[in-house]
């Protein structure tokens, strides 16, 4: 059984998600200790538990240590099965982070996998559902990944209530070298149970800030009724994105500007992928082989994901500084 120190590097939930996904792919049983050891509230939270439970269901794994606050788990997979699964994370637990825990394994499933997931689609400290759909999936398609998601309903913190359907087919991943895409910025600004002018103001503020920086954009707006109150905006171009969520007392103009200010440094750098996508791509690139990208900043999430991935797979990542950017490659 492979022993993984859960406090290594970034030491958060992502390390656990990547380790479990690659355990499923390789069939290697694992024991992860010191999970979220240095966090204010160490151990597993509800959304981590639901992700691990889902991964265990899909690959018929034996799993122990699955309880709130647990700092150690063991996970022994059998085989990755297909089929249909209904998952309710509860409240506003992140749907996108749950998917991160299982998506790297799904190309190796025996048959197609269909998921219906309830939870949070737009919550803090996780990719928005629009980011996953328009940035992450676009990048994964280049690596031969076969999957899609359909947003049924937005769900915001703290009530959640979002709903997503997802569909994945077994596939063979292929190598790809990511280059900067040249096109206009697109976006989606949305709000539920709020005045219709809220998403409009978010979009207008983002467009204005982007144009001041020299980047034209086309941002769609949506206003609707849903289970929870909230707003958000996501911007994307190629393999680069930026997003911001509304908060009580935060003007809509500030939300839009925050999203623009997140994507502008990424665009100015000339990197092929943004700093968030950079860490997400690591396990897929390792499974595909001979792939690369450039990124403006090497985050602790990325270096941690590289370390975890190299524990499971016979690959070696290389990091080189080139013209002010970091080139990350695997062979």
Swiss-Prot record:
Gene Ontology BP term (one): RNA processing
Membrane-spanning residues: none
Keywords assigned: ATP-binding, Cytoplasm, Ligase, Nucleotide-binding
Main location: cytoplasm
EC primary class: ligase
Binding positions for ATP per the UniProt entry: 100, 276-280
Catalytic activity: a 3'-end 3'-phospho-ribonucleotide-RNA + ATP = a 3'-end 2',3'-cyclophospho-ribonucleotide-RNA + AMP + diphosphate
Gene3D superfamilies named among the record's database cross-references: RNA 3'-terminal phosphate cyclase domain (3.65.10.20), RNA 3'-terminal phosphate cyclase, insert domain (3.30.360.20)
EC number: 6.5.1.4
PANTHER family, sorted: RNA 3' TERMINAL PHOSPHATE CYCLASE, RNA 3'-TERMINAL PHOSPHATE CYCLASE
NCBIfam families: RNA_3prim_cycl
Stated name of the protein: RNA 3'-terminal phosphate cyclase
Organism: Methanosarcina barkeri (strain Fusaro / DSM 804)
Lineage, opening ranks: Archaea, Methanobacteriati, Methanobacteriota, Stenosarchaea group, Methanomicrobia
